[in-house]
Amino acid sequence: IFEMDADFSHNPDDLMRLYAACAENGADVAVGSRYLTGVNVVNWPMSRVIMSYGASKYVRLVTGMPVHDTTAGFVCYRAAVLRHMHLDRVRFKGYAFQIEMKFTAYKHGFRIQEVPIVFVNRVLGTSKMSSGIFSEAMFGVIKLKLYSLTHSYEPAPQRNDNR
């Protein structure tokens, strides 16, 4: 099951690479990563690059999650992951839900693999980023981490394809 921006910021040609990570390479979640091999972003203002890259670094520091692009919106999920995760419990409303989804999958023990992509900023339209969305992400990550210290996560089911 894929998630991607519909404004072609994510290249549809990369869908097969994300699919291959799950179908052939044993990943449960494949993340189209802007930051796996440096910063691969085209036509974003420097302030947005710094904010996005910094946010991913912050999330990694707070959560310990080994994902370089924690805010990525280009993701392939095996259906079993989404069935297992209790999506009705996702609390974040803004872009931070991207972080919550990856962190929850990670805590359940699902295998996350990043696939390097180049993100090209949209030609038309504007970002929905706001101070409220930014605050939700900053403080929400701390809440996620604190919750994870006091609650257990049901282990991911064993895959039947020996991966």
Residue positions per predicted region:
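Acceptor/aglycone-binding surface of glycosyltransferases and processive sugar-polymer synthases
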Residues: F2, P12-Y95, R122-F139
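The conserved acidic donor/metal-binding loop of glycosyltransferases
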Residues: D5-S9
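Terminal low-complexity segments of carbohydrate-biosynthetic enzymes
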Residues: D13, E24, A80-V81, G109, ...
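Short, hydrophobic secondary-structure boundary micro-motifs
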Residues: A30, D69-T70, E114, T150, ...
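Catalytic donor-sugar/metal-binding loop of nucleotide-sugar-dependent glycosyltransferases
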Residues: P66, R89-K93, K102-F119
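DNA-recognition element of transcription regulators
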Residues: I99
